[in-house]
Amino acid sequence: MRAAALAATMTELADAGYASLTLDGVARRAGVHKTTLYRRWGTREAIVLEAMLEYASERVPIPDTGSLHDDLLALASSAAATATTPQGEAMVRAVAAAGGHDAALAAANHRFWTERLALDGEIVKRAVARGDARPDVDPVEVIEAVLGPIYFRLLVTGNRPGRAFIERIVDLAAGGATASCEPRT
């Protein structure tokens, strides 16, 4: 039931958008009664949050290649590929459109990114532990430096992030995380 409900939520999000998404619609699509959804999740925001986390964890795994650069490249590539699927685009646009006007969605979005950035930050923590990144680097900021330009392209310019673009932003972020801490003159 859980898997069907979460998949139905992502499909409903892609088809109807967040503003029109209802637990009735999700229940119909999942083939369950809406009271089942209310008992388990309670609110539309709660099921959307869990569906987004599940969707992202399935499609954007946390890589562990042994190389900071390669891990960031794999993460950025899978994030961009996921964000350009119908469900991924709906997820990104729903959060961008409703987040500023819908306090519950804004809170769910904040929880999503707090959890996801902490998970992704493990890439950088492993690099620090291997001696491949500066010990003073903030793992979340490195991940934001990689993912931020991807979402900027999708939301602001409407451009899809191509492979060359992804490689350039990863080069910049990895370079910053591994650069010497010596003072500039």
Which residue ranges define each predicted feature?
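Short, basic, alpha-helical segments at the C-terminal edge of helix-turn-helix-like DNA-binding modules
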Residues: M52-E58
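Amphipathic alpha-helical packing segments from all-alpha helical-bundle domains
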Residues: P86-A90, A103-A129, V140
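Helix-turn-helix
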Residues: A4, A8, E12-A46, E50
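Short loop-to-helix capping motifs
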Residues: A16, T43, A98-L105
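Helix-loop "lid/cap" segments that line or gate small-molecule binding pockets
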Residues: S77-A83, M91-H101, V170-G176
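Tryptophan-centric aromatic hotspots in well-structured domains and transmembrane helices
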Residues: R40-W41, L147, Y151-F152
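Hydrophobic alpha-helical connector segments
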Residues: V60-E89, V142
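C-terminal peripheral helix-coil segments that are non-catalytic and often amphipathic
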Residues: A74, A118, E122, R126-A129, ...
